[in-house]
């Protein structure tokens, strides 16, 4: 571990020199690239330097202890020594976590897609509730949300809705939401007071750069049409909505806001994210066949969470976490769940590192 940390610290110093080089300062791409790399290493270097300083301080105390016979001084030095010895294991654990390979998508913006599944109108209403929950959470994190495409249900909510979430670390916070979400509650239209179970699926797709996935113009079919709202009524009087089909895969992306130019840009952004996600899902399925991660396979059909309204309970099935805070969670207070899932993922990766499997 410490050999790795020495390499990280050495690279950090190299980046310091590069960022003061006039050739780099005058090249915006290099400046941005090196600044980001240095920022990514900053926490690891800070903790490692603190760890080394504590080790040196401990060595100095041990040396002083060997040179003194003064009881009062010995007692004071031993107290300092014990305090540092208690700190070191925590710093070592923190360094192990900091050395875990970072998900390359963590800092990216995302496209979130929510689809009503089993449960008819109630599933569509629940899809709308999830959309509201994520929007409130995004707002609390300083992220920006923008609807890309929405198909409203006649009785409220959405048959399906996709929206972008922009902000540093958006994917790292929302990536664990992939999967099937189940709700148990009495629908407003249910006169007998019976509890119904409905589901909605959530897909979180990292937005991708052009360099990450190649799309040829000849592989695209672009159609324009009039967008419609709930009940089928036309929202726009011009053909501003855009549908883009990727012919080799059959993947389709649409956007139906007022501007055709903006719709084309949004639809292309979604198409790229879906094609990239398709590639990632194939790779994950190969990996999942060898080892199932602690936070699930990421399979879209995997039931990950249940929202039980009568008992005000939310259960995340991947890590066995149950919280009696349904009201707060539906208002966007997802921090406790996301932190627990992040910790579970880190623990899982740490086990693999210790077994030499990464």
Swiss-Prot record:
SUPFAM superfamilies named among the record's database cross-references: Release factor
PROSITE patterns the UniProt entry points to: RF_PROK_I
Domain of life: Bacteria
Gene Ontology terms, MF aspect: translation release factor activity, codon specific
Transmembrane intervals: none
Keywords assigned by UniProt, alphabetized: Cytoplasm, Methylation, Protein biosynthesis
PTM description: Methylated by PrmC. Methylation increases the termination efficiency of RF1.
N5-methylglutamine, modified sites: 233
InterPro entries according to UniProt: PCRF, Pep_chain_release_fac_I, Pep_chain_release_fac_I_sf, Prokaryotic/Mito_RF, RF-1
One GO CC term on file: cytoplasm
Subcellular location: Cytoplasm
PANTHER family in alphabetical order: LD18447P
Family: Belongs to the prokaryotic/mitochondrial release factor family.
Protein role: Peptide chain release factor 1 directs the termination of translation in response to the peptide chain termination codons UAG and UAA.
Descriptive protein name: Peptide chain release factor 1
Organism of provenance: Staphylococcus aureus (strain NCTC 8325 / PS 47)
